[in-house]
Amino acid sequence: VSFNLNLPEGNTVSNVLASLKLKSGTLIKSEDFSAKYYGSPINDWKGSLIDITPQKRYMINVAEKDTICMKGSPYLTEEFPITISPGWNWVGYVPSTGMTVTQAFRGLTPLNGDIIKSQTLFAQYVAGIGWIGNLNFLEPLKGYLLKISNAGTLVYPTSTGNRPIEAISPEALAAQAIQEAPMTFDF
């Protein structure tokens, strides 16, 4: 999962996950940090993960299906570049509309065999052809694993040439139209 809204009260773990029915042992982790929820008498998150950033992918482990609801302002993608290192990178999706893998990674230099994957889909870069696989479209609120050969900086584009990126899916168009509505994640 990734989070692409700036909450008025701040993007701490406890603010972002406030709508969850929290139980002891609920866990959120990024590539480098994690936080675990401790119930009564503590009733708080403890760990090295303090703030949620839009550049990162997160994994959340809950005891039962739950929904995260958020209300905030969308981030400007150009204000949140993502440093990409050779090897595996946990990448958040900053834009509030979806785009193709090719559009999203146009600022990177992929090599043959580089991989992008979501929880259930993937694409591999094939020189001379481009990204192939069943992951064709990156979406808001999803997190991705990117294995890449060349270091770079990922800045999701807001336009292609002189025109805005066209949303491909109806869901992406709907997401843009309701940016101020609560965002819901089902686990």
Task: Label each region the model flagged.
Residues 1-187:
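N-terminal exported-region signature
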